[in-house]
C-alpha cells in the first residue's frame, strides 16, 4: 500500500524524507552558487506557527532548541489578508481586531509552553510570503515550522510548509508534531 502512496508523491528526495519520517528535519537553502562561508551558529531563530493543534509541540521544540543554542527566538504568525465581501458587514477596525485576537492566542501559547521568546509578530498575508519575508527582514539564521500528521500519516507536511521550505531565505527545521 505504501508504494501506491509513494508513487503519487511528486518532488525531490527532500519531499519524500519529509513525508516518511517523524524526526525533525533540517533543510538548507536552495542556492545557485555555494556560499563563501557557512554560519557556524544559529543565533537568531524564528518559529512560525499557524495556531493549529500542533503549534504547542512546535513552539516547545523550538524554544528548547533555541535555549540549548543560547539563541534569540522570535515567534511569527501569518493571518489571512482578509478583505470584506459584499455580503459580510465588517465594522470598525476589524483588521486590527483579527490581529489582536491572533496575538492574544500566541501569548497564551507562549504562556502555556513556558517558552522564552524575544518577540511575537503577527502579520497579514499569504503564509509562505509572510513567513519568508519576516525571516529575511529579521535576519533569521534558522526557521522552525511544524509538520503535523494528517489522516494518521506521520510527517505529512501541509502545502504552505512545502512552499516555506522551498522559498525560505535561511535553513528550515520542520518538526513533526
What residue ranges belong to the model's regions?
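Structural beta-alpha unit
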Residues: 1-2, 111-143, 148-153, 170
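Small/aliphatic-rich secondary-structure junction motif
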Residues: 40-92, 96, 115, 119, ...
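Short, structured interface segments
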Residues: 14-34
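Short beta-strand elements of ligand-binding domains
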Residues: 24-30, 146, 173-176
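Short acidic active-site motifs
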Residues: 13, 105, 127-132, 160
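Short, surface-exposed alpha-helical segments at coil->helix boundaries
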Residues: 96-107
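Glycine-rich, Arg-bearing micro-motifs that act as flexible, cationic patches
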Residues: 1-16, 142-167
Amino acid at each position: 500500500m505504501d508504494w501506491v502512496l509513494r508513487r503519487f508523491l511528486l518532488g525531490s528526495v527532500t519531499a519524500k524524507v519529509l513525508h516518511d519520517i517523524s524526526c525533525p528535519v533540517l533543510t538548507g537553502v536552495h542556492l545557485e552558487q555555494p556560499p563563501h562561508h557557512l554560519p557556524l551558529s544559529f543565533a537568531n531563530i524564528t518559529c512560525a506557527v499557524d495556531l493549529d493543534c500542533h503549534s504547542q509541540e512546535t513552539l516547545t521544540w523550538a524554544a528548547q532548541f533555541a535555549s540549548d543554542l543560547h539563541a534569540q527566538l522570535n515567534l511569527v504568525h501569518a493571518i489571512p489578508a482578509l478583505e470584506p465581501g459584499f455580503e459580510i458587514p465588517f465594522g470598525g477596525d476589524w483588521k486590527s481586531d483579527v490581529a489582536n485576537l491572533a496575538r492574544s492566542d500566541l501569548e497564551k501559547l507562549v504562556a502555556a509552553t513556558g517558552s522564552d521568546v524575544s518577540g511575537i509578530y503577527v502579520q497579514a498575508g499569504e503564509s509562505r510570503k509572510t513567513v519568508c519575508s519576516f525571516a529575511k527582514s529579521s535576519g533569521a539564521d534558522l526557521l522552525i515550522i511544524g509538520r503535523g500528521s494528517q489522516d494518521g500519516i506521520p510527517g505529512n507536511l501541509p502545502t504552505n510548509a512545502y512552499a516555506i521550505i522551498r522559498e525560505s531565505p535561511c535553513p528550515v527545521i520542520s518538526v513533526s508534531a
